[in-house]
Amino acid sequence: MNYQQEFRNIGLQLMGNMDSEEWIELYKKLVYWELELSESEDTSIFEILKQQKIEANVQFSKYYEKNYQNWIRKESGNEPLLSHRLLSDKVFPHLKEDKPTFLIVIDNFRFDQWKALQPMVEEYLRVEKEDLYYSILPTTTQYARNALFAGLMPYDIKRVYPDLWIDEDEQGNKNQNEHLFLQKQLARHNMDIKTTYHKVLNVQYGKKMIDNLPNLMQNKLNVIVYNFIDMLSHARTESDLVRELAEDENAYRGVTRTWFAHSPLLEVLKFLSNKDVNVFITTDHGSVRVARPIKIKATKEASVNLRYKVGRLLDYNPKEVFAVAKPEDILLPRLNILSPYRSEEHTSELSHCQ
């Protein structure tokens, strides 16, 4: 089937009442055709796909807003897998096996980027299963990755571990306690195992990781976080040079492939390919390239993050944002008596787990 035939089917799906699994399958279709058509000389077909993807993003954002509160409170009965349940559902069951498990978390890593890298990964590893999960909101490292490692929503992290949670208005790295959150989650699941946690922020540390891999084979769980894709995503916004190198989504995937082909991460996978281990590759959240920014006016105390705003006296168009007056309603911590959250409506996204 070519895209011209698939176009009508996707259009009909978008007019229907899809559930979370059907949205995942639709997203997979759109990514498949985006990769297939990105090199096509027929730019008119690719433009049609881009418009269909924009429409899908709009509808998906509405779907997210309508269902999100029920999902996180498990009130719908058919909740998708969310960030805070990822490890307990997908990784922890494998820790009972008599072999080491390596969990590789690539910050801000999208599904289309994974599909672009998959052929290189499969030169060394066999992909046994590919799943997608839904990121919690806001889709930022501060919230999504802390939830992933803690196995709790941010509201509950602050409630249960107040000394470890760093609030929006506090100084310091908001993700500096991820390794402790992981230990706490393992303890809640009665898993007394040898675990290591590593955050790779530069090539030098990445190379040290390679040298240390033989020692990690003695542990039941080894977690390695890679931040390059997230840094690339931010540089794409802030640097003219990077913006030129990754001017569209196809070029962005190309930069990702180039990085991966020469990265210490690929060397890690090569090493693991000769060992009897479980390997999970996942992310904490994805990203969306915003073509039409939403204006939100706020006091100077409001958060500066581009994906969401929290603060007093926020002025915005309610049709353009997902607004929550009481943060605890979506299990986010309250900073003060007046701290509503506003998330741009057109930046919801799926995250994934391989």
Question: Across the structure, where does each feature detected by a protein language model lie?
Answer:
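Feature captures the catalytic ectodomains and active-site-proximal regions of enzymes
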Residues: 1-354
